[in-house]
């Protein structure tokens, strides 16, 4: 039998918060708002899961806006155990913004191209978004016209920040 007693000690109080966004996404209003409204504030008790959640939310939002290379150049929480204090420093480097380029639709020759494109939640030249690709796939699936729907894009094929997308459709059997 093993008995363990843990003394968590006193919580650390946040004495400083510095959250910055750099790169081409620094001028994005939503990223600036998330950085300035970071939920952990000076004077609050450090809650690490809340820190991780807020940190992930900022990076996820950058990616949703098309900054697929967004990564933290600095992400640290310096805790002074003796002083029971913590300083949070985050620096998100967004990298370049990506956009959709061409959208190739394959596998549904019986449907006009303009008809199929109505189901897409994105257009060429719009900011790249995995969420919009997923929404497009869902809309095409929900149309019940296709047995299989694949909406994909390969960032490795990007040229000048523009990523081509493919929509691959397998029509459902015709119901008469």
Where are these regions (language model features)?
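Periplasmic polypeptide-binding modules associated with outer-membrane biogenesis and secretion
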Residues: 1-176
